[in-house]
Each structure stands twice: as structure tokens, then as C-alpha cells.
């Protein structure tokens, strides 16, 4: 190694040693600062006047629960002052030794433990001092609370004394609980003044709760007593009186246990008084509600019968008139059937329907007479009579609907006859008009399809007229033949228009094709075929298709042009 390198090495070692020394001095100073702070915190804790506070509470000569609590906190303070502070002192001394001997890591770890110890001691001392303060203040705190509780109690006593009649059977139990609360106050005073404010506070808590609970009871009882002793019995008496009047007025009831239900309600009132006496207020309130529901149910029964009586009177006044009206209607229906039977073949169901209705009306009349005759001494509840009479009214309404249906069918017979005669005359005229319309077209011949439709329509029209000329007209047969003839006439009219349209358009297209025939052999050939079909087969539709297809090749759209023009000027059949 050269001299230069040796010098550099020595300088480097010197720098490292200086840095190490500086770091060591820094760590040592920092630990010393932390130790001094911990020493100050320890001294502050040690100098707290806890001993004075302990002596002050000890001189109060506590007893009972208060004394037990004091002993626990006092023992905790003794343990702290004798053991915990000594441990901290030893740990501080040990940490200083580590710091002076440059064992900084151990010193730092020891300092951390001391900080934790002091923090725990701070918390324990705070808890001890708070507990001692509570013990010292408990007596005066109790004195303040008891004044408020006494005010509430005296107010409660005053309310009960001034309104004793409102509490009914509950008064004895309320007064008994007032006496119990009074005893609790005496017990509180004894404990609080003899050195056990903690136990006294527990007694005071219970007393306050009992006052609040009894106040709530006192609030609820009057309404329950009024309902049970006055309102419900009054309602029940009114119901009984109303029931007697209804019985005297010959009312009957579906329910056969009404008297027993009255008795059960009175028994329920007596039993519920026991709930009031024992201050079972929830049970008493529930039983009051049940009794009210039963009274309401009985009231509904009576009002139902009263309302039903009015409905029955109204039905008995209107049903005979209604029935008489329906009997008259049935007589008119019978007369209509007899009159129509002279001209028309009516189905047997019409006459049998009217006879059945007559039988039902007679049975309903007997039922109405029976109910009416029993009204002076009714034997059924009006609600039952109401149901029966309303059912009877519904059945009469159904029969009336049947009468209306029969009447409409009978009336329709003559209307159908008149309509068929009018249509027959119209169809005869249409046949003549269509025949003349076709003759004016000067067609080379009439297609067989037209002739078949024409003769079919003519024959069916004749059949319709024959049916109408019968001595006894079968209107169902007339209606059936009329429908056939109507369909035939519609088909004939459509076929007539089609034949004339295709014949006219074919003639126009044949004439128009002359401009192409001289130089277009295909059109010439189509012309010859179409003309042959037109003049010999009389199939004007096929002839039209033949010439139009050829012209469309030479001149697209020409067919539509002719069709559109024709539709604008087409001659209609004037019936």
C-alpha cells in the first residue's frame, strides 16, 4: 500500500469515527430528554392530591354499597402508590444506565415501556379521582334528585285525592302503590343520610320509575273506568230497551241467542272490573274493546231488521202491481200468438213458453198473497222476508225479460213478412232491368255463367213469392229462401257488370290493335284468337286477356289506360 492510500484510509476512518461519535451524542441527548420528560410526568402524578381526596371521602364514614365502592378504589390507589411508582422509578434508573453505557436500543425500548406504564397509571388515577368525586358528590346529587321526585309524587297524590271517584275499583291498588312509594322515600332518606348514597341512588332510581309508571296508570284508568262503568252499560241498556220494543212490534230475528248475549255482556262487565281493580289495564282495555264490538254487532242486527222491514213494506206494495202488469203482458202475448197463428206457422215453443210463464206467474201470485196475509202477525225475520221477496222480484224481472224477448220475436215475424214481400218485388224488377241492360249491349252472345245465375235467381225469387202466397206462411222458410235469393241477386249483378266491362274493353282493344296488326304478326295472331273467342265462345274475359297480353308487349301500360278510362265512364244499371 502506498503512502497516499494509507493517508486516505486513515482520513476515512477518522471521518467514520467522528460521525459515529456525533450520532452517539445525538441519541444520548434525545434519550436524556425523553427520560427527563417521563420523570416530570411521574412527579406530577405522584404530587396529585389523591391522598387528600381519599381522606376526605374516608371521613364521610360511608356504609353499605358506598363503603364497598370506596374500599375498592382506595385499594387500587394503594397499589399504585406503593408498587407502580416504585416500578417506574427502577425502570427510569435502568434506562439511564443503558443510555450512559451507549446501549441506545435497549434504552429506547425501556423508555417506551415506561411511557406505557405512566399512561396506564394516568388513566387509573383519573378513574380513581372520578370515582372518589362521585362518592363525595353522590349525597348532594341525591338531595337534588329527590326534591324533583317528591314534587312528582306530591302532584300524583294530589291528583288521586281530588279525583278519587274517577278511579273506581282501581283506587285501592293505586293508594297501595302510593304507600309503597312513600316507603321507598323513607328508605332513601335513611340510606342517604346514614352514609350510603350509592345504595340510596339505586333506591331513588327505582322510586322515580315507580312514580312514572303509576302516573301512566293514573292517566289511563279514568277513561277505562268511564267506558266500563258508564258508556258500555248505557249502550247495552239502550240496546235491551230497543230489543223489547222490536219484540213488542212483532219483529223476529234470525239469531236466537240475543238474550244470552245480553247476559254474557253483563258478566263480562263484572269480570273486567277485576282487571281494573288489579290495574291490569291492557287486559281491561282489550275486554272493553271486545264488549264494544259485541254491542256493535247486536246494534247491526237490530238496524238490519228495521231497514229490512221498510224494504219489505215497499216490496209488498209494489210486487202485486208488478205481477199484475206481467199477467196483462202475458195475456197480450197469448192474443198475439192466437192472431199470428191464423196467418203464420208458428213454432210450438212460442205458445208453450207463454203457458209456462203463466204457470210461474200464478205460483208467484200465491207466494205474494201468502206473505201479504201474514204481515199482521209475521212469523219470520224481516231480513229473511226481504231476501225472499227480493229473490221473487229478481225472478219476476227474469220473466219480464222473457216476455220482452217473446214479444220481440212475434213482432219480428210480421216485420220479416213485410220485408220479404218488398224484397220479392224489388228482385222481380231487378231481373227485368238486368235483362234489358244486357240486351242493350248488343253482345254476340250471352255467356252460360250469366244465364245460369239469371235463371237461378229468377227461380229462387219465384220460390220466395210462392212461400209468401201460402195460406199459412212459414216465416222461417221465407227467411231462408229470401237469404238465398238475396245472395243470387248480388252474384248476378256482379256477373252482369263483369261481362259488360270485359266485352266493352275487348272491343276497344281489338280496335286499338289495328295500328299494330299490319306489321306485328304476334298481335295479328292474338287479334284473330281473341275475336274468335269473342264471337263464338262468348268468353269475354278470356278474349280480353288474350288481346291485352299481346298489346302489353308492344305498348306496356295500354291496358290500364283503357281500364281506367272505362271505370270513369261506366254505365250503371238503373233499377
From Swiss-Prot:
Subcellular location: Cell membrane
Membrane topology, from the record: Single-pass membrane protein
Chief location of this protein within or outside the cell: membrane
Cytoplasmic face residues: 28-575
Biological-process GO terms, alphabetical: division septum assembly; septin ring assembly
Keywords noted in UniProt: Cell cycle, Cell division, Cell membrane, Coiled coil, Membrane, Septation, Transmembrane, Transmembrane helix
Cystine crosslinks: none
Coiled-coil intervals, chain numbering: 105-191, 265-301, 354-416, 456-526
GO CC term (a single one): septin ring
Bilayer-spanning residue ranges: 9-27
Residues in the Extracellular compartment per record: 1-8
Family: Belongs to the EzrA family.
Protein's job: Negative regulator of FtsZ ring formation; modulates the frequency and position of FtsZ ring formation. Inhibits FtsZ ring formation at polar sites. Interacts either with FtsZ or with one of its binding partners to promote depolymerization.
Protein name: Septation ring formation regulator EzrA
Species per Swiss-Prot/TrEMBL record: Streptococcus pneumoniae serotype 2 (strain D39 / NCTC 7466)
Gene: ezrA
Amino acid at each position: 500500500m502506498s503512502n497516499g492510500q494509507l493517508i486516505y484510509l486513515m482520513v476515512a476512518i477518522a471521518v467514520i469515527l467522528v460521525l459515529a461519535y456525533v450520532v452517539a451524542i445525538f441519541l444520548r441527548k434525545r434519550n436524556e430528554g425523553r427520560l427527563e420528560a417521563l420523570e416530570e410526568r411521574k412527579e406530577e402524578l405522584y404530587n396529585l392530591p389523591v391522598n387528600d381526596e381519599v381522606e376526605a371521602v374516608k371521613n364521610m364514614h360511608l356504609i353499605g354499597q358506598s363503603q364497598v365502592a370506596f374500599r375498592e378504589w382506595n385499594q387500587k390507589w394503594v397499589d399504585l402508590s406503593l408498587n407502580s411508582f416504585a416500578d417506574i422509578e427502577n425502570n427510569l434508573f435502568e434506562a439511564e444506565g443503558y443510555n450512559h453505557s451507549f446501549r441506545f436500543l435497549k434504552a429506547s425500548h425501556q423508555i417506551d415501556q415506561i411511557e406505557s406504564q405512566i399512561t396506564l397509571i394516568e388513566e387509573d388515577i383519573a378513574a380513581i379521582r372520578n370515582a372518589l368525586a362521585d362518592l363525595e358528590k353522590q349525597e348532594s346529587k341525591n338531595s337534588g334528585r329527590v326534591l324533583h321526585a317528591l314534587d312528582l309524587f306530591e302532584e300524583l297524590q294530589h291528583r288521586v285525592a281530588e279525583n278519587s271517584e274517577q278511579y273506581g275499583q282501581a283506587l285501592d291498588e293505586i293508594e297501595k302503590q302510593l304507600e309503597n312509594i312513600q316507603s321507598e322515600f323513607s328508605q332513601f332518606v335513611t340510606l342517604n343520610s346514614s352514609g350510603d348514597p350509592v345504595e340510596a341512588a339505586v333506591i331513588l332510581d327505582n322510586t322515580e320509575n315507580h312514580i312514572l309508571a303509576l302516573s301512566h296508570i293514573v292517566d289511563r284508568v279514568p277513561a277505562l273506568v268511564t267506558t266500563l262503568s258508564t258508556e258500555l252499560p248505557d249502550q247495552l241498556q239502550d240496546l235491551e230497551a230497543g230489543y223489547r220494543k222490536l219484540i213488542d212490534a212483532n219483529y223476529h230475528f234470525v239469531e236466537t241467542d240475543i238474550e244470552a248475549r245480553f247476559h254474557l255482556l253483563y258478566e263480562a262487565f263484572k269480570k273486567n272490573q277485576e282487571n281494573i281493580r288489579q290495574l291490569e289495564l291492557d287486559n281491561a282495555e282489550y275486554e272493553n274493546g271486545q264488549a264494544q264490538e259485541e254491542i256493535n254487532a247486536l246494534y247491526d242486527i237490530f238496524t238490519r231488521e228495521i231497514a229490512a222491514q221498510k224494504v219489505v213494506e215497499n216490496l209488498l206494495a209494489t210486487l202485486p202491481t208488478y205481477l199484475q202488469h206481467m199477467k196483462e203482458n202475458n195475456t197480450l202475448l197469448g192474443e198475439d200468438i192466437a192472431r199470428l197463428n191464423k196467418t203464420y206457422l208458428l213454432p210450438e215453443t212460442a205458445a208453450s213458453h207463454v203457458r209456462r210463464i203463466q204457470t210461474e206467474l200464478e205460483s208467484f201470485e200465491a207466494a205474494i198473497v201468502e206473505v201479504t196475509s201474514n204481515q199482521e202477525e209475521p212469523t219470520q225475520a224481516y231480513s229473511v222476508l226481504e231476501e225472499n221477496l227480493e229473490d221473487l222480484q229478481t225472478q219476476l224481472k227474469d220473466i219480464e225479460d222473457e216476455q220482452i224477448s217473446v214479444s220481440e220475436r212475434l213482432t219480428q215475424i210480421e216485420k220479416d213478412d213485410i220485408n220479404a214481400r218488398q224484397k220479392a218485388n224489388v228482385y222481380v224488377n231487378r231481373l227485368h232491368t238486368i235483362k234489358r241492360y244486357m240486351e242493350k249491349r248488343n253482345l254476340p252472345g250471352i255467356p252460360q255463367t250469366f244465364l245460369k245465375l239469371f235463371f237461378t235467381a229468377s227461380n229462387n225469387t219465384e220460390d220466395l213469392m210462392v212461400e209468401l202466397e201460402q195460406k199459412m206462411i212459414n216465416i222461417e222458410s221465407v227467411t231462408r229462401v229470401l237469404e238465398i235469393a238475396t245472395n243470387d241477386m248480388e252474384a248476378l249483378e256482379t256477373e252482369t257488370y263483369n261481362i259488360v266491362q270485359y266485352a266493352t274493353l275487348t272491343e276497344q282493344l281489338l280496335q286499338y290493335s289495328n295500328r299494330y296488326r299490319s306489321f306485328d304478326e304476334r298481335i295479328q295472331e292474338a287479334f284473330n284468337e281473341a275475336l274468335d273467342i269473342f264471337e263464338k265462345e262468348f268468353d269475354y274475359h278470356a278474349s280480353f286477356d288474350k288481346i291485352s297480353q299481346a298489346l302489353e308487349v308492344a305498348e306496356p301500360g295500354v291496358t290500364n289506360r283503357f281500364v281506367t278510362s272505362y271505370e270513369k265512364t261506366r254505365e250503371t244499371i238503373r233499377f
